[in-house]
């Protein structure tokens, strides 16, 4: 993983952002309209709203991605985080998450939140290990 680089948004990587996220969303859930709009229009749904999308690049290939969406002044949402299935468990997600947290703190974030589902156990474990806390259990079985 020495060759792994975490890089900011690049229009060349838009297709990878959609592909990596589509894979996990369609495997575990039903693609919702808001998800589809974000995946197909990341510039208007993330970048133009004061957010950032990071990419994990290994040997020239995008192998992971995560978005920080500014929700309001000082409040950011971690969203659309994905790592290529064959490379999960190798620390790529943690590196992406750490970069996202750093990005938000650099911009004065006072709150960073995410919405997840308890069926995504490895992801939930990662979030908890990086300092996120479980605040609420919703009827739809998602946590934030």
Describe the predicted segments one by one.
Residues 4, 8-79, 84-86, 97-99, ...:
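Acetyl-CoA-dependent GNAT
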Residues 84-86, 90, 118-119:
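Active-site acidic-Proline motif in GNAT/NAT acetyltransferases
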Residues 94:
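Residues forming the Rossmann-fold NAD(P)(H) cofactor-binding site
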Residues 104-116:
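Conserved GNAT acetyl-CoA-binding A-motif
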Residues 113-118, 124-144:
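Conserved catalytic-core motifs of GNAT/GCN5-like acyltransferases
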């Amino acid at each position: 993983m020495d060759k792994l680089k975490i890089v900011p948004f690049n229009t060349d990587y838009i297709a990878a952002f959609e592909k990596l996220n589509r894979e996990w969303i369609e495997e575990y859930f039903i693609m919702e309209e808001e998800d589809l709009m974000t995946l197909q229009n990341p510039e208007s749904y993330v970048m133009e709203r004061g957010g950032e999308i990071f990419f994990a690049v290994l040997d020239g290939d995008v192998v992971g991605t995560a978005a920080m969406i500014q929700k309001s002044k000082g409040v950011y949402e971690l969203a659309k985080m994905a790592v290529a299935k064959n490379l999960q468990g190798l620390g790529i997600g943690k590196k992406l998450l750490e970069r996202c947290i750093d990005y938000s703190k650099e911009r004065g974030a006072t709150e960073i939140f995410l919405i997840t589902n308890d069926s995504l156990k490895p992801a939930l474990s990662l979030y908890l290990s990086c300092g996120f806390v479980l605040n609420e259990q919703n009827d739809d079985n998602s946590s934030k």
